[in-house]
Design a protein with these regions (language model features):
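Buried hydrophobic packing residues in well-ordered domains
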Residues: 1-3, 45, 70, 107, ...
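Sec-exported extracytoplasmic/periplasmic mature domains
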Residues: 75-86, 108-112, 143, 152-160, ...
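A short, gly/pro- and small-residue-rich
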Residues: 129-146
């Protein structure tokens, strides 16, 4: 799909019908409610891992693994987005195992205006854990690039996070073309300093607010 310069398309998908193939193209939605800038928009949050899939392990081991960090942040971010008028869906609301296929299928079924997968990073065993930190954003489809750059710059700037960059990668949950689909790596769980920041309730709230601000700015453009 080739998009003309200046067109603000945020999604497309092909539907098979009895008459052939139907191409759906979506333009960026915008709320006209100044007090609720995300009113009428739907956002899907994807807390990474869960259940038997713990994700990265930090200083407290399984007592507070990446899966818990991701879910706590997702709930805080959901509250921030709902306060701005958005309808928010979560791929999981508790500590359960959800396959990558099911996560992407939920996105395809709901067709949200935005899909955000929340993760925290790990690292190799032979790396000095005190020297690896930072925030990064990942995506696959070019239609997510504007959002990625805006969110990355806002979060790292407002919170003073170490820059780990924006990256193109074929992560399964970012394959959706029907909406901007991105994956956040909020920090490195094995790093004790990063772990303390990632698990602190006040810092989680600050991060959630910063992400919500960036999302709001994106839909106002």
């Amino acid at each position: 799909l080739t998009v003309r310069p200046g067109e603000k398309l945020t999604g497309y998908y092909i539907e098979k019908t009895s008459g052939g193939l139907l191409l759906h193209v979506k333009r960026k939605p915008q709320s006209k409610d100044q007090s609720l800038p995300l009113k009428g928009l739907s956002i899907m949050l994807d807390p990474g891992h869960g259940g038997t899939e713990t994700g990265a392990i930090g200083p407290l081991g399984l007592r507070y693994a990446e899966k818990d960090i991701n879910l706590n942040l997702a709930k805080k971010l959901a509250a921030e987005l709902e306060a701005l008028g958005a309808r928010v869906y979560l791929t999981r609301e508790d500590d359960r195992t959800v396959s990558l296929e099911d996560r992407l299928a939920m996105s395809k079924m709901m067709l949200p205006d935005l899909f955000v997968s929340l993760h925290a990073n790990s690292m190799a065993d032979n790396v000095d854990i005190s020297k690896v930190d930072g925030f990064s954003v990942w995506y696959r489809e070019p239609l997510a690039k504007d959002l990625v750059e805006l969110l990355y710059n806002h979060v790292t700037g407002s919170l003073g996070r170490t820059l780990k960059g924006t990256h193109v990668r074929n992560f399964y949950v970012t394959r959706g073309t029907w909406t901007p689909s991105i994956l956040l790596e909020t920090g490195f769980v094995p790093n004790p300093q990063e772990f303390e920041w990632l698990t602190d309730e006040a810092e989680q709230t600050r991060l959630a607010k910063s992400i919500a601000e960036a999302i709001t700015a994106y839909f106002r453009e």
